[in-house]
Amino acid sequence: VKSALVVLVLVLSAACSAQAAPTARPEDGDVETGGISPFDNDHPAIRNLDPALREAVQQAAKEARAARGIDARVTSGWRSRRYQQRLLDEAVGKHGSVDEARKLVNTPEKSTHVSGKAVDIGPTDAADWFSRKGSRFGLCQIYANEMWHIELATTPGGECPPLLSNAAAG
């Protein structure tokens, strides 16, 4: 019993002294679960987007709602370098290597989220609509493994470039 108490004290002591993982903040571009309105221009994830991308996403969101009643949400937009690095570090921990993690999360130096040139759209029906109809607004799905990742990659009404297999391929 005494040794069990010692172990319990050690475990509780370690738990209390462990530092919590840093959390992202809205000023870093963190977006609440479920996403935010693409019209929330006061949120850094929207405000810091490239203006042409922001306008195209807002126009597409209006059309998706009018045509199909789809409520498009931005689940990720602009991100600070710090937040992007945190996401990459978490992905490395989850997937075991930088090479595997980069298939889903790019480095801050290469991320189009950091440069304000990409948004992730949700929920699934909205991501699907943007993937199929977004080119009307110049918006394109970029990665085959991320239907939600959208960039301004053509002229309105133009043809989207071929999909890249994943973020590491670009």
Predicted regions and their residues:
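Secretory targeting and sorting signals
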Residues: 1-21
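Cell-envelope/glycan interface and biosynthesis
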Residues: 21-170
